[in-house]
Amino acid sequence: MQSEMNYYKFDRAEWSQFHSQNFTNVTDEELAQLRSLNDEISLDDVKMIYSPLRHLIHIRYEDYQGDMFTLSRFLGMQRNPHTPFIIGIAGSVAVGKSTTARLLQLLLSRAYPEKRVQQMTTDGFLYPNAELERRGILDRKGFPESYDMELLIHFMNNVKNASGALRAPKYSHQIYDIVPGEYELIDRPDILIVEGINVLQLPSKQPIYVSDYFDFSIYVDANPDLIEQWYLERFGILLDTAFTDPNNYYYQYAIGDRADAFAMARQVWRDVNLKNLNEYILPTKNRADIILHKTTGHEIDQVSLRKW
């Protein structure tokens, strides 16, 4: 274990010593369903990395429930049993946030079978493409100004206040836009996992931040060169699956010259995703409670735990 600034740092073997014996039974078939397009995760990852992480979240969740009870007793109020414990997961495009979110949802659902554990992404709170075009910022999609932060914060406030069943806008990577009339239903979860590149950011014009609603936060980290490789691999898979569907956003690239398509993807990575990572996403890393660092093959080789 290393101690650096405000984090304890553990390599893979060291971290696995923390309650990996509480390995939750997960099958290869379940992992295959959880994986994002070109992500990689194994049963070894579940045992060595995610089982100890699940146990840490269990401890934080128990503490949270105790804090809520203490506050309710101080105020002389009955505690709302549906005030959720919210976990935020941040990191670059293509780094594997969605896989982490889905796996944690599975593990926590197994740990708390009587609880409602849900997962959502902030992609649905991007402005629709038509609105981005109207504002002249379609080429900055994914940057802070491309999100309807007021709507997202209003949504998070309603979730935290257990305001009943709520509808989150739905985003589709196939059409590269918000899906009109379709929503994800978030219905009074006990635990909610919120995944998105922007969840730890501090927008300058907001009096309250998305992260203010989090009770635990995770940043998925990797070398930008590796993330670019994963981004391009994912782009190739999207091309392979889009060429038969004219309604798919990637169809136009799938039926054209593949070299030209990848040249475009590299430019998007350089001008949009890498710039967004360096300027707005990476600076939020040290706000997370846990940093999961990935290396070749999406293997997590280091876990950093915030000291305070």
Swiss-Prot record:
Database matches in Gene3D superfamilies: P-loop containing nucleotide triphosphate hydrolases (3.40.50.300)
Compartmental location: Cytoplasm
Domain of life: Bacteria
E.C. no: 2.7.1.33
Keyword list, A-Z: ATP-binding, Coenzyme A biosynthesis, Cytoplasm, Kinase, Nucleotide-binding, Transferase
Any one GO molecular function term: ATP binding
Matching SUPFAM superfamilies: P-loop containing nucleoside triphosphate hydrolases
Catalytic activity: (R)-pantothenate + ATP = (R)-4'-phosphopantothenate + ADP + H(+)
Gene Ontology cellular component annotations, sorted alphabetically: cytoplasm
Pathway this chain belongs to: Cofactor biosynthesis; coenzyme A biosynthesis; CoA from (R)-pantothenate: step 1/5
Pfam family, one: PRK
Alphabetical list of InterPro entries matching this protein: P-loop_NTPase, PanK, PRK/URK
Chain positions recorded as ATP binding sites: G91, S92, V93, A94, V95, G96, K97, S98
UniProt-listed GO biological process terms: coenzyme A biosynthetic process
Family, per entry: Belongs to the prokaryotic pantothenate kinase family.
The protein's name: Pantothenate kinase
Organism: Lacticaseibacillus paracasei (strain ATCC 334 / BCRC 17002 / CCUG 31169 / CIP 107868 / KCTC 3260 / NRRL B-441) (Lactobacillus paracasei)
